UniProtKB/Swiss-Prot annotation:
Record field: compositional bias (Basic residues): 83-97
Segments of the chain annotated as binding DNA: 104-172
Presence of keyword Manganese: no
Cellular component terms per the entry's GO annotation: nucleus
Lineage top rank: taxon: Eukaryota
GO molecular function ontology, one term from the record: DNA binding
Coiled-coil residue windows: 230-274
Protein name: High mobility group protein 20A
Amino acid sequence: MENLVAGSTLPPLFADEDGSKEGSDVTVTGLAHSESSFTGGTSQPVNNPDLVEDLSQVQQLQNESTNTAENTEQKPEEEQQRTKRGGWAKGRKRKKPLRDSNAPKSPLTGYVRFMNERREQLRAKRPEVPFPEITRMLGNEWSKLPPEEKRRYLDEADRDKERYMRELEQYQKTEAYKVFSRKAQDRQKGKLHRQDGARQPVHDHEKEADTKERSVFDIPIFTEEFLNHSKAREAELRQLRKSNMEFEERNAALQKHVESMRTAVEKLEVDVIQERSRNTVLQQHLETLRQALTTSFAGVPLPGSGETPTMETIDSYMNRLHGIIMANPQENENLIATVRDVVNRLER
């Protein structure tokens, strides 16, 4: 019996937990292999009160130790995930940017005008397409749009921009703009003051001032400041590329417009030269006709006044002669016959 007690051992977890107790006297009875150690099916009672007589206690202690180890392993992982999780602080609200409700409406670019006009048409035509896909399709359509069709949107954008500049210039002279400017300056000062107080203690203000004055070339890489600086530069470059592309498209459209105008001007110049030549020929023919009429009607004085034509008065002479004949054709039959003879001689 003493050999059995000495040979039986507890699981490692149980032995570690009860190592401070009297572990030398603890034995486990009722195990399956103990039955084979006794012959005849007889067993002797164990009178030691420190013995563990139920395997459920061993299992319970082992489960508790396992759960404790798992909990200790999960806590660092949860804490690590909590530290990795960034973003806006819980319970903190984002402040809306200060907007001036009295300011004139900002102008829209030609691309935005095209998007606003075509978006509803495309959504009505294909309602199953999601919004991001519609935006992508409209972007491709704008890039493939001919410069002549883009010209309409760009011209509208230019007119809208001129309107905005005029209204903004007038608005900046009003009292409402001055009040809004003071509010914006006060808010910016308060924001800078709060940021300075939250980032650095009072005794580090001089060091912070020196840090702000340093050049962008002194920013250490792989830092939050460097990443923010890179993001700002990338955003600025994207905006510059976009503006450059718009100006190139506008320049190409203007170049085509200039070429078409130059061609039209050259054509008009040729037409003007031709018309001048034709007018010169007609003027010469008119002078020849006046001279012939003056010579032919020199012997035909006007009834009542006796006026005969000259090179300077041939036009008025012919008008008066026509008026006299049309007024009384029966009384001026002889005059009509004379005029017919003169005209027949001119045709020959």
